[in-house]
A protein has these predicted regions:
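N-terminal low-complexity segments that are often proline-rich with Ser/Thr-Pro
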Residues: 206-208
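C-terminal catalytic domain of photolyase/cryptochrome flavoproteins
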Residues: 1-204
């Protein structure tokens, strides 16, 4: 459940391997194809391309590296300045199992699956209505593969303030997402063990 990744991003960011090398190897293992064939490889290639795309954005639109959103009018969003809710999110104590599990894994290992990053980011910016930049800064202090361009791009996509962003009305439902990607609740129970001792299903909201 929610762990089928190559985990190469820290090595790419450190310059140990290159994006080009990854694409060459992907073609070798996929009958010389990048956009067809093995679905897992095709998806992996798309993630590498997103990484390069966000580098293009930060190079050509440097304002996104200066604490500004890509979409200008979104800088006027009246964010919720709830320091208590923000801290509970940072501590993995929101009561939403999949959100808390993702945060706790990151705090313990420096890693979080990309799908979880989107779920966690949307929960902060669209459910709690807290400025996405708070999450962007927090992720950069915790992720082992922390990368300014990808981190900024991912957060702005989730908060609907960036280029090619998710529509503002798109909000990932944490419960349905966790049921889809962690149907047995194995991942959640690993990082939020309290779930195992309640009468609730692993995907239901916990009350702290």
């Amino acid at each position: 459940a929610i762990d089928a990744t190559a985990k190469l991003s820290p090595y790419i960011n450190a310059g140990i391997v290159s994006s080009k090398w990854c694409l060459v190897k992907a073609k070798e293992f996929n009958n010389d194809m990048l956009d067809d064939g093995d679905k897992g490889i095709v998806h992996w290639v798309s993630e590498i391309l997103w990484r390069e795309f966000y580098r293009h954005i930060i190079y050509n639109f440097p304002k996104v590296s200066k604490n500004l959103p890509f979409i200008d009018y979104t800088k006027n969003i009246p964010w919720n300045e709830d320091s208590v809710a923000l801290q509970r999110w940072k501590d993995g104590k929101t009561g939403i199992p999949i959100v808390d599990a993702g945060i706790r894994e990151m705090l313990a290992t420096g890693w979080m699956h990309n799908r979880l990053r989107m779920i966690v980011a949307m929960f902060l910016s669209k459910n709690l209505l807290i400025n996405w930049q708070e999450g962007e800064k927090f992720f950069m202090t915790k992720l082992i593969d922390g990368d300014i361009a990808s981190n900024n791009g991912g957060w702005q996509w989730s908060a609907s303030t960036g280029t090619d962003a998710a529509p503002y009305f798109r909000i990932m439902n944490p419960e349905t997402q966790s049921i889809k990607f962690d149907p047995e609740g194995e991942y959640i129970k690993k990082w939020v063990p309290a779930v195992s001792y309640t009468h609730l299903r692993a995907h239901e909201t916990l009350n702290h």
